[in-house]
């Protein structure tokens, strides 16, 4: 019988054909994947920013020229300009304030000097802004000053506002502050910085860097918030808190500035503003509020169950609105803290409901030396949290705290809940 040679040739050609088709398929797949990636990248670059606040920090000087020297916000003093020649600016810093919103530098003007942006403001522009700030409408929107606050003189804040319609970006530039009081009695100076909050949401808080030992700090920092429609700007307010950094204790509050944006037109370009810093209006009630807690001592397991239930009538932290309270629970044995817990933060409410349970291990013989401290704090993102009120339960505690603790010891295995008035922290 003759051999079948034809079928063998056909079987030998099949792997070659399959290999060719596989190579073409691989090249097509890689090309298709690369094309899809390019399309996604181009679509992502052309996509409009989402409706949310994003702050971008600009204009941070690495080496400020002279933090203690005063800078003129308006036009230069003519008497000083005539007597002194313009010196070249030899200090190294990032002049990011001169960039546009896209991050590009504008074309250089050979006629322009090397002075900073604050000194380039023309006297005419500052005069118009000053007239607007002193107009009756502006005086109505600005915070009124009492006679006592006018005598105290806490300084002046200089800033600028701008809106970019193409990017839907709201730009706030904190330029400088002048004439701040000395918070350090020894050095007769301050370490100032500024916190800014957008109201009424109170969700978006930013702050400048700390400038050391100066009463006339030049911040020149820009914060950009993208995705805000221009009509929504009229519903917002800007709250500035001027503070002095303290390394060893709570930062000192110098004063505050509140600027309602209703009636302010930003369609004509950048608007320069000056506002007097006034004494902080804490708007706190006579009391610190109340806290409802429930405790139970289990003698069989030597455990103390603490339930933080509710808080009510908590005072406002400041004019920026309601506080964001949470409770910190500290367990002490002979005046030494041996354990700590804390609840979740409740946003913008004077009447918070926590309902959170904590269990602490306690030896039975040392129950008389145990005390429980409750600290109600206001959550401040990016800074130290402020203590709203304090409560102590223990054998040596005064008032309702001592009575509540006595009931816990006398009636073990019973959950005992009581309201307590908070005292100063």
Curated annotation (Swiss-Prot):
What does UniProt note about where in the body, tissue by tissue, this protein is expressed?
A: Expressed in many regions of the nervous system but is undetectable in extra neural tissues.
Q: Where is the composition biased (Low complexity)?
A: 137-146
Q: How does it sit in the membrane?
A: Single-pass membrane protein
Q: Where in the cell is it found?
A: Cytoplasmic vesicle, Secretory vesicle, Neuronal dense core vesicle membrane
User: From what organism does this protein derive?
Assistant: Mus musculus
Q: Which gene encodes it?
A: Syt4
Tell me which InterPro entries the record gives. Answer: C2_dom, C2_domain_sf, Synaptotagmin
Q: Where this protein primarily resides, as one coarse class?
A: membrane
Q: What is this protein called?
A: Synaptotagmin-4
PTM description: Phosphorylation at Ser-135 by MAPK8/JNK1 reduces interaction with KIF1A and neuronal dense core vesicles mobility.
Domain notes for this protein: Unlike in other synaptotagmin family members, the first C2 domain/C2A does not bind Ca(2+) neither mediates Ca(2+)-dependent phospholipid binding. An aspartate-to-serine substitution in this domain inactivates Ca(2+)/phospho-lipid binding.
Q: Which UniProt keywords apply?
A: Calcium, Cytoplasmic vesicle, Differentiation, Membrane, Metal-binding, Phosphoprotein, Repeat, Transmembrane, Transmembrane helix
The entry's family comment says: Belongs to the synaptotagmin family.
Q: According to the UniProt record, where is the region Disordered?
A: 127-147
The record places the following residue ranges in the Cytoplasmic compartment, namely 38-425
Cofactor(s) demanded: Ca(2+)
Q: What does this protein do?
A: Synaptotagmin family member which does not bind Ca(2+). Plays a role in dendrite formation by melanocytes.
For molecular function, the Gene Ontology terms on record are: calcium ion binding; calcium-dependent phospholipid binding; clathrin binding; phosphatidylserine binding; protein heterodimerization activity; protein homodimerization activity; syntaxin-1 binding; syntaxin-3 binding
- Specify whether Calcium is a keyword of the entry: yes
Ranked from the top, the taxonomy reads: Eukaryota, Metazoa, Chordata, Craniata, Vertebrata
């Amino acid at each position: 019988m003759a051999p079948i040679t034809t079928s063998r040739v056909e079987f030998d050609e099949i792997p070659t054909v399959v290999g060719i088709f596989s190579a073409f398929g691989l090249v097509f797949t890689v090309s298709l994947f690369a094309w899809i990636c390019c399309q996604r990248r181009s679509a992502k670059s052309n996509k409009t920013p989402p409706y949310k606040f994003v702050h971008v920090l600009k204009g941070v000087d690495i080496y400020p020229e002279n933090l203690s020297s005063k800078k003129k916000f308006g036009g230069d003093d003519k008497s000083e300009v005539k007597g002194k020649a313009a010196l070249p600016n030899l200090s190294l810093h990032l002049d990011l304030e001169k960039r546009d919103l896209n991050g590009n530098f504008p074309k250089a003007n050979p006629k322009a000097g090397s002075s900073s942006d604050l000194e380039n403001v023309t006297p005419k522009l500052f005069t118009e802004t000053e007239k607007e700030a002193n107009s009756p409408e502006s005086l109505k929107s600005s915070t009124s000053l009492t006679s006592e606050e006018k005598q105290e003189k806490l300084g002046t804040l200089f800033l600028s506002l701008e809106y970019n319609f193409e990017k839907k970006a709201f730009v706030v530039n904190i330029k400088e502050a002048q004439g701040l009081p000395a918070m350090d009695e020894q050095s007769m100076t301050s370490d100032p910085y500024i916190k800014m909050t957008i109201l009424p949401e109170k969700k978006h808080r930013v702050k400048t860097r700390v400038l050391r030992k100066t009463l006339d700090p030049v911040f020149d920092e820009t914060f950009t918030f993208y995705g805000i429609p221009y009509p929504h700007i009229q519903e917002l307010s800007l709250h500035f808190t001027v503070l002095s950094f303290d390394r060893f204790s709570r930062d000192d509050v110098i004063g505050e500035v509140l600027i309602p944006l209703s009636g302010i037109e930003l369609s004509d370009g950048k608007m320069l503003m000056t506002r007097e810093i006034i004494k902080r209006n804490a708007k706190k009630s006579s009391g610190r509020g109340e806290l409802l807690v429930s405790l139970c001592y289990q003698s069989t397991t030597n455990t103390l169950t603490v339930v933080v239930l509710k808080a009510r009538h908590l005072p406002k932290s400041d004019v920026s609105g309601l506080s964001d309270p949470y409770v910190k629970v500290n367990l002490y044995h002979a005046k030494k803290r041996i354990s700590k817990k804390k609840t979740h933060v409740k946003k913008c409410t004077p009447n918070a409901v926590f309902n959170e349970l904590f269990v602490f291990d306690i030896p039975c013989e040392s129950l008389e030396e145990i005390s429980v401290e409750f600290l109600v704090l206001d959550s401040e993102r990016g800074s130290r949290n402020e203590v709203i009120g304090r409560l102590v339960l223990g054998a040596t505690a005064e008032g309702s705290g001592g009575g509540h603790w006595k009931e816990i010891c006398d009636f073990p295995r019973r959950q005992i809940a009581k309201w307590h008035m908070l005292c100063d922290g």
